[in-house]
Amino acid sequence: MADKLVAGKHLRYILNLMAEKKKESFESVVMDHLRMNGAYWGLTTLALLDKLGSVSEDEVVSWVMTCQHESGGFAGNTGHDPHVLYTLSAVQILALFDKLNILDVEKVSNYIAGLQNEDGSFSGDIWGEVDTRFSYIAICCLSILKCLDKINVKKAVDYIVSCKNLDGGFGCSPGAESHAGQIFCCVGALAITGNLHRVDKDLLGWWLCERQDYESGGLNGRPEKLPDVCYSWWVLSSLIMIDRVHWIEKAKLVKFILDSQDMDNGGISDRPSYTVDIFHTYFGVAGLSLLEYPGVKTIDPAYALPVHVINRILFTK
């Protein structure tokens, strides 16, 4: 059992993983199409640990820009198709390095705005899949770029609210099951647009705090599922945004995250004794940030970027 965050080993794990991306390792091959997301997870973890300077800014930024398409959207890697998922990660990475100025903001924002549907929802790409994840991504990305006026915000918000369920949660579409990941997306989008008053905070807060497993202290994403470190982000961030985070046992959740670390080689897994990956490493450290763990920089619960980065963007003309 772990009693502290082994930040130095997580740093080494992430840097080794990034070095492997240049080789034909198994993990680099299976994650090739979503490398942009992996880069965001790894780099944001480094930023939260105050170690972003450990990577080559020029190398990362140059690679990110090779993933942009003529449409303005970004792909998960060079040679792949653009999607809003990867576009947000690309924008977030550039924000980390204070390089948003190299973007053709008009082009990127037009790409995102062009994916809004008549009912206010958003498609993820030209193939038309609709999901509240994409609503959050569009709103978050356009807010960072200061281009929310490019879309019909009222319709976007009304669509998100139409995905609210009787249990207070939100699903991926109207009538779909409540899920912590979708709840983060919907609550995050409502927070960014100033519409949190449309959330039943007590009802949703109860549903979210019920996600904590009594024995392990970990959180799950929906009823009758195993606890998973990634929900330390999805559930906690939502609770913070609706001011109900005091409804869970924070100390038990901290222990669950710390116990999910690989104490020898670094990295964090979905639960204790499982295999680590960059996805859970990021969400574990981000969860500790939300829990105000010592030595971890503060992350914004709506934008999923360090608070100092968001302050620099939103309070700079």
UniProtKB/Swiss-Prot annotation:
Keyword Metal-binding: yes
MF annotations from Gene Ontology: metal ion binding; Rab geranylgeranyltransferase activity
Binding site for geranylgeranyl diphosphate: 179-181, 222-225, 231-234
EC number: 2.5.1.60
Keywords carried by this UniProt record: Metal-binding, Prenyltransferase, Repeat, Transferase, Zinc
Gene3D superfamilies in UniProt: 1.50.10.20
Origin: domain of life: Eukaryota
Protein name, as recorded: Geranylgeranyl transferase type-2 subunit beta 2
